Amino acid sequence: METEAIENIPRVCLPQIGAPAPDFKANSTFGPIKLSDYRGKWVVLFSHPGDFTPVCTTEFIAFTQVYTSFVERNVQLIGLSVDSNPSHLAWVENIYKTTGVEIPFPIIEDKDMRIAKLYGMISPAETSTSAVRAVFIIDDKQILRLILYYPLEIGRNIQEIIRIIDALQTVDKYKVLAPANWYPGMPVIVPPPKTYPELKQRLKNVEGYTCTDWYLCYKKV
């Protein structure tokens, strides 16, 4: 019986990491927007379950408090929920009136859940049609680089999102790998050899590297 119940849950099609991010047009608190208009910038597209909810409110305040950190990294923040634009506007105004925080980025209206379904933000296992708490990081070439999902009860760690962007931009720029718990300024991993001749060459030339073994070498960037 339990197996049958699981099998009856509809499958959610998610966009794939490394593939082009699905384009969309939408109305927002900043007017009409189109994802492809942000080509050349990184995008953090994040969904929230609903306006006027406590955890989401703390997240939007937290995003705003470090908004300049995203701007410095050439990142555009875009929020989304299945609420209406009037609801978004009322919520944003309420946040400003009660906390003095003015939300500086657009929030998408997705009443028909078109974008939420396109990005797999609606969980078929939930009884609510609210969008799950998700994060999609899209690079300046409109390639989807990362997907994060959070339970409805737990707010996002905004500093971790910034750390991930730093890591992605660093590995792109220097063609390296980021180790566990990496932060800017720490050593990065040199990609390991892919062939035996490359392995032999690595063993001969480790100048500038700190190596544990041939497949794990670090360097500063």
Swiss-Prot record:
What residues does the Thioredoxin domain cover? Answer: 15-170
Listed as disulfide-bonded, the cysteine pairs are: C211-C217
The UniProt entry lists the main location of this chain as: cytoplasm
Q: Which Gene3D superfamilies match?
A: Antioxidant, Horf6, Chain A, domain2, Glutaredoxin
- The active site is formed by C56 (cysteine sulfenic acid (-soh) intermediate)
The record, for Pfam families, names:
1-cysPrx_C, AhpC-TSA
- Quickly give the catalysed reaction: a hydroperoxide + [thioredoxin]-dithiol = an alcohol + [thioredoxin]-disulfide + H2O
Q: What is its EC number?
A: 1.11.1.24
MF (Gene Ontology): thioredoxin peroxidase activity
Record's GO cellular component terms? cytosol
Please verify whether the record's keywords include Disulfide bond. yes
Keyword Disulfide bond (UniProt)? yes
* Residues that coordinate or bind substrate: R133
Per the entry, what this protein does is: Thiol-specific peroxidase that catalyzes the reduction of hydrogen peroxide and organic hydroperoxides to water and alcohols, respectively. Plays a role in cell protection against oxidative stress by detoxifying peroxides.
- Give the family per the record: Belongs to the peroxiredoxin family. Prx6 subfamily.
How this chain assembles, per its entry, is:
Homodecamer. Pentamer of dimers that assemble into a ring structure.
**What name appears for this protein in its UniProt entry?**
Peroxiredoxin 2
